[in-house]
Amino acid sequence: CCAFPQWCGAGCIVPCC
């Protein structure tokens, strides 16, 4: 999961959006 939602899909293994 990303620590910050705005990072989802931008380098996260498991997007959390």
Swiss-Prot record:
Question: Where in or outside the cell is it found?
Answer: Secreted
- Give tissue specificity per the record: Expressed by the venom duct.
Alphabetically list the UniProt keywords: Disulfide bond, Hydroxylation, Secreted, Toxin
Which cellular components does GO assign to this protein? extracellular region
The UniProt GO MF terms for this protein read:
toxin activity
- The answer, when asked if Kinase is one of the entry's keywords, is no
Task: Output the superkingdom of the source species.
Answer: Eukaryota
Would the keyword Secreted be found if you checked this record's keyword annotation?
yes
Domain-related comment: The cysteine framework is III (CC-C-C-CC).
Q: Which family does it belong to?
A: Belongs to the conotoxin M superfamily.
Q: What is this protein called?
A: Conotoxin reg3c
Origin species, per record, is Conus regius (Crown cone)
Q: What is the organism lineage in this UniProt record? A: Eukaryota, Metazoa, Spiralia, Lophotrochozoa, Mollusca
